[in-house]
């Protein structure tokens, strides 16, 4: 499942965040890549312990944990602290699959990367190229969203970032360990939950709603891992 979640941040908030990112000191993005990925990765990255990364990352997670669409689709158990990158001057990241497990807090905790997310802090007209290209069931999907918007997709997906030939592309990316490991099961639960919400709005007193809601929770109980 590939899902576009709009307006995590407002235009005014994005403008302030991007201004701060533009003034930050960036490092070589290869530092956080695995052995194979490092050979394909050509970008800049904000150090993970940078105060700005922590500040914006905490604000992002607070928004997302209170966002009904993200919660419904991701069913998050744990989230890897958001990272921040910049592509400019031909920077790119060739096709790769993210590492299956990420260490957090110096290895004291681990996060399984069931879902990948990218939150854009540059508008499409601010740069040329830089599309996030994701290979899914329906072929190659090119993603280039407005600043403040997020795309959520399975961590198992082969993906790349096309070269940025003009301007700069600022974004954040992170991984989520879901209560439900399998993408097909998460997709089914998401579709059920969205249907339940629509029916609750349109026919709130329909007796089948209780049964359908019960079925959703029984499936979640069967498939969830804690």
From Swiss-Prot:
Gene3D superfamilies (alphabetical): q2cbj1_9rhob like domain (2.60.120.620), Rabenosyn, Rab binding domain (4.10.860.20)
Cited SUPFAM superfamilies: Clavaminate synthase-like
UniProt-listed InterPro entries: Oxoglu/Fe-dep_dioxygenase_dom, PKHD_C, PKHD_hydroxylase, Pro_4_hyd_alph, Pro_4_hyd_alph_FE2OG_OXY
Cofactor: Fe(2+); L-ascorbate
A GO biological-process term: intracellular iron ion homeostasis
EC number: 1.14.11.-
Top-level lineage group: Bacteria
Fe2OG dioxygenase domain segment(s): 78-178
Amino acids binding Fe cation: 96, 98, 159
Covalent S-S links between cysteines: none
Co-factor binding comment: Binds 1 Fe(2+) ion per subunit.
GO molecular function: 2-oxoglutarate-dependent dioxygenase activity; iron ion binding; L-ascorbic acid binding
Chain positions recorded as 2-oxoglutarate binding sites: 169
Keywords: Dioxygenase, Iron, Metal-binding, Oxidoreductase, Vitamin C
Protein's name according to its UniProt entry: PKHD-type hydroxylase PiuC
Organism in which the protein naturally occurs: Pseudomonas aeruginosa (strain ATCC 15692 / DSM 22644 / CIP 104116 / JCM 14847 / LMG 12228 / 1C / PRS 101 / PAO1)
Lineage: Bacteria, Pseudomonadati, Pseudomonadota, Gammaproteobacteria, Pseudomonadales
Encoding gene, per UniProt annotation: piuC
């Amino acid at each position: 499942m590939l899902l576009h979640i709009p307006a995590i941040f407002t235009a005014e908030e994005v403008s302030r965040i991007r201004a701060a990112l533009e003034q930050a000191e960036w490092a070589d993005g290869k530092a956080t890549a695995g052995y194979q990925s490092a050979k394909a990765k050509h970008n800049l990255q904000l150090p993970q312990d940078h105060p700005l990364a922590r500040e914006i990352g905490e604000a992002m997670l607070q928004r997302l944990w209170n966002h009904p669409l993200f919660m419904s689709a991701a069913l998050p158990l744990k989230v890897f602290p958001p990272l921040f990158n910049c592509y400019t001057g031909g920077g790119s990241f060739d096709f790769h699959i993210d590492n299956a497990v990420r260490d957090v807090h110096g290895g004291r905790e681990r996060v399984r990367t069931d879902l990948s997310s990218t939150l854009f802090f540059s508008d499409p007209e601010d740069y040329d190229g830089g599309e996030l290209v994701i290979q899914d069931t329906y072929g190659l999907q090119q993603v280039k969203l407005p600043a403040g918007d997020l795309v959520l997709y399975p961590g198992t997906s082969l993906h790349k970032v096309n070269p940025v030939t003009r301007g700069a592309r600022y974004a954040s990316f992170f991984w989520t360990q879901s209560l439900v490991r399998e993408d097909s099961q998460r997709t089914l639960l998401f579709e059920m939950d969205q249907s339940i919400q629509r029916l609750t709005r349109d026919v709130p007193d329909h007796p089948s709603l209780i049964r359908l809601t019960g079925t959703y929770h029984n499936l979640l109980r069967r498939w969830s891992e804690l």
